[in-house]
Amino acid sequence: MKDPKSHKLKFNHYLEKLYQSDKAMIIYKVDQGYDIYTDFSKRINLTKQNIHKFLNSFEKTTYKKQTDQYVGFFGYEILNHLLGIKINKQSKNGFYKGVFYKPETIIQIRDNISIFSNKKKQEFNKYFKPTKILSPFKLNIKYQKYKKIFDIFSKKIRQGETYQIKICTKYRNKSSINPINFFWRLMKSNASPESFMIRDKNYSIVSCSPETLLLKKGNKIITKPIAGTLRKSKKTNMSSALKFFRNNSKETKEHNMIVDMERNDLSRVCVPGTVKIDKEKYVEEYRHLFHYVTSISGSLIKDMTIKNIIKSMMPGGSVIGCPKIRTLELLNQQEKENRNIF
């Protein structure tokens, strides 16, 4: 479809049919708008047995057209396996360790709508799922258990085994959710940079993350760690938030630790001397919060593999702490439930 303008109404009708269908699809926010992926010809469920083969396959792939790509997610546990870190026995919820899809249709929503598809005929099964909250939210850990883990980690910090560590807690409930409606409602109220939605037959994910963990542009790689959060109020603005972060010893030290770790992670895959701070300790404003951010970049070593980039950069320091390896080991000793897509 070479002329998006002449097909605009038709494309909008197509999107409505897609949204109301039961087709698996992914929506991903980009700088200029949104990309939608669907008509998946392949679905790879990641396991300990196939993760290396999957990542290595990209080194032999030639990219001739827009649909020559995979889109999906890595779970926390599969990234630990990739790093060779053992996870103690935990309670599991049966969720996937990671899933990647090969799309045959990509829809770009910009000022106009463009469709790139290898499919000649589109078929839709009409389907609509209303959103209903069926039970109240519950926390997955009791206060005394959380305090016990907190005290153990406090001791580890005093002993110098870790400098910063992030305990994971989950809220859960039973709901019937239309993930597409839910995603677009979030985008109206809080369109964060790393927002996406996955809808498949047996699961959905809706994410609205402000943090850019990993962005590759040509041979340049960028990360924007967030360490520092302030709730918005009528008395706070960008200037007062920046002043708060700069004058707060705790926030500054935590931020510096994460930035140092991310710079070190980048240096593993970048040309020596190219890792630099592009913008240091600035504030990003969202609907309910201010975040303390630093932007870091580097030039990738020639022929650096995707697998090595992922091993170096994931999981991000803002969700685990630092230093990376020892902190992951400590978390895995104490957390009794899988993080999955955390």
PLM regions and their residue ranges:
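Extended alpha-helical targeting/anchoring segments
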Residues: 1-342
